[in-house]
Each structure stands twice: as C-alpha cells, then as structure tokens.
C-alpha cells in the first residue's frame, strides 16, 4: 500500500508540473525573458526554500545544515543545478518548435534515462567508496529501457504527425513547428536536464539524518539544485532584457498584480513535481529499485500528462486515428514502466 501511495504522490506532482505552462498563458505584456525570470523566482527560490525548511527540525536551521555538510557535495549539487539550468532554457525552445506534448516527451524522456544512469555513475567516480553503481540493477535498467521505448513510440507519433499535416495545419497547432530543429534541441535539453537528478544524488545526504522525516530528506538538495539553475537562467534572462531592451517590462505597474499571481501559480505547479518526488520517495524506502527509478518515473509521468494537455490544447488536431493510436500506445508503455520493475 505504501508503494501505491508513493507512486500516487509522484503522479500528482507530475500532473501539476505538466500544467505549469497553462497559467503562463495568462501573463500580459511581458516578454519571455521577463516572465521566465519572475516565475523562476517562485519556482527555483521561494517554494524550494519553503520546502527545504520542512526538513529542518526544531532548534536547528538551514544555515547550520549547510555549514555542517560536506562542502564538495554542496558545490557539486549547485554545479549540476547550474548545468540543469541550461537544460531548462533549451527545454522551453523544444516546446516552441515541437509543442507541449512532443517537446516535453522527447526532452523529458532523454532526461529520465540519462538522469537515472548518470547520477550513480558520476557519484561512483567522485566517491567510489559509496558503491553507487550497485544501484543500477537489472530491474532499474529495465525500467529505464521501457521508459525510453515509450518515449520512442511517442516520438514516432510525432514524426507521423509531422509527415501527415500540411504546413498550415502544423502552424495552426504549433506556430513555429520545426521537427528536425526541435528534435535536436529537445535531445540537448534532455541531456542537460538530467543533471538535476545528478545534483540530487550528490546532495542526498544533506539533511539532519534521523531527525529529518524520510519524505523531506531530499528537499534541501532540491533547493541547492534549483538555486544553481536560477543563477544560469537569471544571467540569460538579464542578457535578453539588455539585448531586446525589455527592461521596461518590470516598470509596467499596471500588469504586475496579474502577472505576479500567475507567475507564482506557475512556479508552485512546477515545484510540485520535486516536492511530490521527495514526499513519494518517503513511502518507497522499502522498495530500493523504485527509489533509484523515482526520478525516471517522475519524468515518465510528466510525459504522460504533458500529452494529455497536448490533446486538450488541440496540438494533435488533424492527425489520423493511426497517429493517435501510436500516441496512446506510447502513453500506456510509460505508465507500465512505472511499476514493471517492482514486479521483477
């Protein structure tokens, strides 16, 4: 029962993340770089900080925790967060050229596979005494492979969509649709985004041990990863503000109330995925295979729900029933990948 509860919590977080781009559509009169930065303040600073505070027992503080933790682990966690930030920037571009459904599917699929494998591999290189590679069991690799198969099937559906639609229909569904360009960007975004889980692996012991409940133990590391990502994104957004002369966005007081609300909502929905991941892992402590695969499971469910939104937003409008069938098959495979390893 605890395993089911854990997976359900992760699924709720995935649904929230896949919905985070909906409130962004309500933001008025701001350029991309302006609203991306402000929603990032909430998604990568405010809510992760509030989450990390849950891991701090009474009489202690976050400053005490970070000061007493291994400096190498802290800086590696932040570093991989900064690399993940690059993935976040290109992630947005992948959706620009492929749409929400296909863009998230390919990027998150790559992120799921590489993120799950890179974490133990790199941790074993820096700290061989941890024997991190022992986590990569047959069941774990199988889970990753099945996830990637599901992603590949959805990718096939995307290429079928590209081949069957006229240029006018493509532009109607996704304004800047460009499958080859979008595919390359999505793969890069997925590779860099996988660094998030690497950061979590390096920071998994940054907590107060038995004084921190299992469900909150990864939240301090999540804060460090998102902090690194915020720095990367802030630098790029400020650069774009200067390049495009959009500093005036921040001076437009008439839209601040509306935009702040929807940026905060988008940030909360985005952070929900990693808050849910931490809570869900607290119920998976007796299932080591699912613990290792938890990030992969989260990404797989993100893909499932992003495609649900893609259907709702009519991004697959005009596609043949055969294309939709392939898409649904891919979604089913991804759902199966979430619990199949536990049956091995």
Where are these regions (language model features)?
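Polytopic alpha-helical membrane proteins, predominantly small-molecule transporters/carriers
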Residues: 1-344
